[in-house]
A protein has these predicted regions:
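Beta1/beta-strand and adjacent pyrophosphate-binding region of the FAD-binding site
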Residues: 2-15, 31
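Glycine-rich FAD pyrophosphate-binding loop
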Residues: 24-44
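C-terminal lid/capping helical subdomain adjacent to the catalytic/cofactor pocket in oxidative enzymes
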Residues: 121, 370-445
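Dinucleotide-binding Rossmann-like beta1-alpha1 core, especially the glycine-rich loop
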Residues: 48-148, 280-281
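Active-site substrate-recognition segment that forms the wall
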Residues: 21-25, 49-51, 79-92, 206, ...
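Glycine-rich phosphate/pyrophosphate-binding beta-alpha loops
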Residues: 56, 168-170, 278-280, 355-359, ...
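Core beta-strand elements of the Rossmann-like FAD/NAD(P) dinucleotide-binding domain
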Residues: 3-5, 212-222
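Flavin (FAD/FMN) cofactor-binding and adjacent substrate-gating region
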Residues: 100-187, 192-193, 199-206
Length: 445
């Protein structure tokens, strides 16, 4: 007889684990299934783990700011669980959003005011006082180093910054997922690893379980797709699900670089997470007194959509899928060096390359599906790490409401943010929404 659970969650990353945690707290018997060896070992491990409040929509800002409470009180969120690997640490550096043409910062400020986000306005003198290595000239528009105008001397200055003192980053994204797994296990959740899903089984349009690559069948009336870059492949296994979604997901190859801090500047101790739309990058401190430099997907940067199976099997045409490219290394580090006076750029690239699971408008899908009992928390890569605990609770409550008879498509589940007290219309994350043109269509969400 097949093993039976109340809910099977495909994926044990930083969103899959919180969903299990919250469902088990509701009394459901859950099983997370992951093809890798441990929690958080997929795209979560390559996350920059940044915690910031700025998003392009008010609901996005509200959910992100709600999430701050969990990161700032990490041990409390975990129920003071013990983890043999230790606990990830929240690095509360504060978060700088530079006022630039690359960010609609006025809209962000309006959202901050509406939601009640704590922030300060910094003028250029204040920025220079807090981060003396920043050159505050305007370099807009974003260019690539091969552009003949890249090294032109700037003549204008930025307008200032919005500073959010509660922002920062988690010290170890994979460990944070592992911590949540241990918290979920303490409530009764189960996890299996090195287990690849090859079939979503259903009967009369009701999900009944999954089949693993080794032939094992596991049954549950609820299956949740939280498979990260493989999410669209899991949806294709569920009869009618992929085709019915108006918003689809796909995998985007993305590179993040590490660059030494300028000599004499302790960026690890004194630095801030910074979103810099003026140069199309974001950066934060990293161990070894490094700048971790990510791309904000400016228009001049090519986007490479890939098959995740080929990427992880190192079968993409230019060689190893996770190999940094010299072209993008130069683009991100040279841009950052224009902002950071004295930045040291090594000859050999150093960093991380992995995949984002992106929706058509870079806003995630947190929703039910055309198949009864089959749910999705997908399209979340690049900008949802910071929302993971909130997303876990929202998905658990949405699933619970739907299983009790709510027609979520007709009347979207109203999710109340416990700390802010605001109610979110979860139809915002619907699979059947039209593309949201308020989105930044980038990692900024």
């Amino acid at each position: 007889m097949n093993k039976q659970y109340d809910a099977i969650i495909i994926g044990a990353g930083v969103i899959g684990c919180p969903i299990a945690y919250e469902l088990t707290k509701m009394g459901r018997k859950t099983l997370n299934v992951d093809k890798l060896a441990d929690a958080g070992e997929g795209s979560t491990a390559a996350s920059c783990a940044i915690v910031r409040a700025h998003y392009s929509t008010e609901d996005g800002v509200a959910i992100a700011y709600e999430g701050f409470k969990y990161w700032l009180e990490w041990e409390k969120y975990l129920g003071y669980v013990k983890d043999e690997k230790g606990l990830a640490k929240y690095m509360n550096t504060g978060s700088i959003l530079l006022k630039s043409q690359g960010h609609d910062w006025r809209k962000v400020q309006k959202h901050y005011d509406a939601v009640g986000v704590r922030y300060e306005e910094w003028d250029l003198n204040k920025i220079k006082e807090m981060v003396p290595v920043y050159d505050l000239h305007e370099f807009w528009p974003v260019k690539r180093p091969e552009d003949p105008e890249f090294f032109n001397e700037p003549t204008r200055f930025l307008e200032g910054a919005l500073f959010c003192p509660e922002g920062g980053y988690m010290s170890d994204p994979a460990l944070s997922a592992h911590n949540i797994m241990r918290a979920a296990e303490a409530k009764g959740a189960e996890f299996i690893f090195n287990a690849e899903v090859v079939e979503i089984r259903s009967r009369d349009n009701q999900v009944v379980g999954i089949t693993l690559k080794d032939g094992t069948q596991i049954d549950a009336p609820i299956v949740v797709n939280v498979a990260g870059p493989h999410s669209y492949k899991i949806n294709q296994m569920a009869a009618g699900v992929f085709e019915e979604c108006n918003i689809k997901t796909k995998a985007l190859r993305h590179e993040v670089m590490y660059c030494p801090s300028p000599q004499g500047y302790d960026y690890l101790k004194d630095g801030y997470h910074t979103s810099d739309g003026d140069i199309g990058c974001y950066y934060r401190p990293e161990v070894g007194n490094m700048f971790l430099i990510g791309s904000e997907d400016p228009e001049c940067d090519p986007q490479e959509w890939v098959d995740p199976d080929l990427f992880y099997a190192a079968q993409l045409p230019y060689g190893r899928g996770n190999e940094l490219t010299m072209e993008q290394w130069r683009a991100q580090t040279y841009r950052c060096a224009r902002r950071v006076t004295g930045m040291q750029i090594p000859n050999q690239p150093r960093g991380v390359c992995d995949l984002y699971d992106c929706s058509d408008d870079w806003i995630p899908i947190y929703d039910k599906s055309a198949m009864k009992g089959f749910y999705m928390a997908i399209g979340s890569s690049g900008n949802q790490y910071k929302n993971a605990p909130v997303a876990g609770l929202m998905m658990a409550e949405l699933i619970d409401a739907c299983e009790k008879g709510l027609d979520h498509d007709k009347t979207p589940f109203p999710f109340k943010l416990p700390h802010l007290g605001r109610t979110i219309d979860t139809g915002f994350f619907s699979r059947n929404r039209e593309i949201n043109y308020d989105s930044s269509f980038s990692v900024n969400g």
